[in-house]
C-alpha cells in the first residue's frame, strides 16, 4: 500500500516538474516516464525485500525497517547514479526528441531518490514506530503467520537453481547466438536509416499509395497512416520547397522532408560513437571506484552482450537503425547496469561476511547472491516491460522500433545480469585470489652505496 501511494506521488511529481520547466512531453518522453516508473518500482522492491529478510530472521519491526533501508540504500543509489550518467550523456549529445527523453529520465532519477528512498523510508518508519503492526508482521512479509518461522540467518531461496554450473551450457549458447547473429547481419547488411547513410527522408501522411518519380529511391516504408520514402539525393532548400508543394497538391496532405548532408551524417555517426564510448567509460570509472575494477570489467562485458543482442535482433529482422536506436541502446545500458549493480552489491555484502575465501566459496557467494536477487530481477523486468509491450501494441509507429529495442534489450539485460556479469566476475576473482603474491626481496645485509669515480 505504501509503495503504491509512493509510486502515484512519484508519477504526479514527475509531470509537475516537467510542466514547471516548460518541457515538451514527446513520445520518447513518455517512454522515459515508463522506464522511470520501472526503476521506481525496483527501488521499492529492493527496500521491502531487505526489510522482509530482516523480519524473517526474527528482528523486531522497527529495527528491521531501519536495517532494511540501510542495506538497500547503496544498491539503489549506485544503480540510479549509473543510469543518471547515461541520461546526462543523452542530454548533451542527443537531438531534440532524445533530449526530451533524457530530461524526463533525469527528473525521474532525482524523484526516485527523493520520494522512493527518503520519503518512503520515513513513512514506513512512522508506521513501524506506531506499534500497530508489531503483532502483524505477516502484513510486511506477505506470508501467513503459520509460515513465518524465525531463523538465525536469511534463508536462501531457489536453492535448486545452480546458476554457476549452468553457465557451462548458457555461455556457449550466448557465444553461438552472438557470433552467428552478427555474422548473418554483417553478410546481409544492416538497415541503416538516412541518419547514417545520408540522403533525404520524405514522409507523406496519407493512406494512399505514394510514388515519387525522378529520384533514386533507396527504400520505402509504409504504415497505416503514412509512407516514408528515402532517396539518395541530398536536396537543397529550393528543391525541398518544390517537392513539398508538389506532394501537398498531389495527395492533399502535409509532407515532412528531412535532409541529411554528408557533414550532418558524419556528425551523427561521430556523436553516436562518442555517446556509447563515454557511457562505457563513465560506468567503468564509477563501478571501479564504488566496487573494484574486476566488477567494472564484468559489468561492461555484460553491457556489450545486451548491446550486441539488441543490434543483432535489428539486423536479423531488418529493422531500421537510426539516431533514436542509439538512444534506445544508451537506455538499455543504463537499465542493464542498474540490474547488474544490484546483484554486484549483494555479492559484495556476501563476500564481506565470508572468511578464508577460496574458489568453492566464491561459487557459493555468486550462487547465493543471484538467488537472493532473482525474484527482484524478474519482478522489476516484468513491471518495466509490460508498459513497453502496451506501447508496442497501442503506441505510435514512430517509436515502434525504439520500444522494440527496449524490450529486447531489457530481456537481454536480466539474462546477462545472471549468466554474464556475475559469472565473468567469478572467473576474474578466482584468478585474483589464486594468483601468487609477489614477495618483497629482503636483503640479508646492507649493500654498499656505489658512487662512480669514488668506489667503483
Where are these regions (language model features)?
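A structural signal for conserved, well-ordered secondary-structure elements
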Residues: 1-456
Amino acid at each position: 500500500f505504501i509503495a503504491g501511494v509512493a509510486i502515484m506521488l512519484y508519477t504526479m511529481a514527475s509531470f509537475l516538474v516537467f510542466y514547471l520547466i516548460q518541457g515538451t512531453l514527446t513520445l520518447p518522453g513518455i517512454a522515459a516516464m515508463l522506464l522511470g516508473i520501472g526503476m521506481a518500482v525496483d527501488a521499492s522492491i529492493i527496500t521491502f525485500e531487505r526489510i522482509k529478510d530482516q523480519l524473517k530472521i526474527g528482528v523486531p519491526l522497527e529495527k528491521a525497517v531501519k536495517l532494511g533501508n540501510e542495506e538497500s540504500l547503496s544498491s539503489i543509489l549506485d544503480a540510479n547514479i549509473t543510469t543518471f550518467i547515461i541520461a546526462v550523456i543523452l542530454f548533451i549529445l542527443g537531438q531534440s526528441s532524445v533530449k526530451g527523453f533524457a530530461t524526463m529520465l533525469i527528473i525521474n532519477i532525482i524523484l526516485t531518490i527523493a520520494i522512493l528512498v527518503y520519503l518512503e523510508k520515513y513513512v514506513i518508519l512512522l508506521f513501524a514506530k506506531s506499534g500497530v503492526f508489531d503483532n502483524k508482521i505477516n502484513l510486511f512479509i506477505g506470508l501467513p503467520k503459520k509460515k513465518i518461522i524465525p531463523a538465525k540467518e536469511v534463508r536462501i531461496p531457489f536453492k535448486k537453481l545452480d546458476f554457476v554450473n549452468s553457465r557451462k551450457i548458457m555461455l556457449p549458447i550466448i557465444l553461438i547466438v552472438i557470433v552467428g547473429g552478427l555474422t548473418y547481419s554483417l553478410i546481409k547488411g544492416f538497415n541503416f536509416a538516412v541518419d547514417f547513410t545520408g540522403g533525404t527522408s520524405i514522409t507523406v501522411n496519407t493512406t494512399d499509395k505514394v510514388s515519387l518519380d525522378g529520384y533514386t529511391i533507396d527504400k520505402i516504408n509504409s504504415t497505416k497512416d503514412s509512407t516514408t520514402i528515402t532517396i539518395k539525393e541530398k536536396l537543397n532548400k529550393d528543391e525541398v520547397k518544390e517537392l513539398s508543394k508538389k506532394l501537398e497538391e498531389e495527395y492533399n496532405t502535409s509532407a515532412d522532408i528531412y535532409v541529411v548532408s554528408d557533414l550532418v551524417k558524419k556528425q551523427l555517426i561521430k556523436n553516436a560513437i562518442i555517446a556509447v564510448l563515454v557511457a562505457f567509460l563513465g560506468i567503468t570509472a564509477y563501478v571501479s571506484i564504488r566496487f573494484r575494477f574486476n566488477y567494472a570489467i564484468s559489468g561492461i562485458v555484460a553491457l556489450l552482450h545486451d548491446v550486441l543482442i539488441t543490434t543483432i535482433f535489428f539486423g536479423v529482422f531488418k529493422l531500421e537503425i537510426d539516431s533514436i536506436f542509439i538512444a534506445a541502446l544508451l537506455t538499455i545500458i543504463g537499465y542493464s547496469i542498474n540490474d547488474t549493480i544490484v546483484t554486484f552489491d549483494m555479492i559484495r555484502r556476501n563476500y564481506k561476511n565470508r572468511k578464508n575465501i577460496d574458489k568453492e566459496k566464491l561459487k557459493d557467494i555468486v550462487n547465493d547472491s543471484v538467488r537472493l536477487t532473482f525474484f527482484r530481477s524478474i519482478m522489476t523486468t516484468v513491471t518495466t516491460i509490460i508498459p513497453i509491450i502496451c506501447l508496442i501494441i497501442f503506441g505510435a509507429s514512430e517509436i515502434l522500433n525504439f520500444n522494440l529495442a527496449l524490450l529486447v534489450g531489457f530481456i537481454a539485460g536480466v539474462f546477462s545480469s545472471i549468466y554474464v556479469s556475475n559469472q565473468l566476475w567469478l572467473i576474474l576473482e578466482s584468478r585474483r585470489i589464486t594468483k601468487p603474491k609477489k614477495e618483497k626481496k629482503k636483503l640479508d645485509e646492507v649493500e654498499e652505496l656505489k658512487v662512480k669515480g669514488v668506489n667503483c
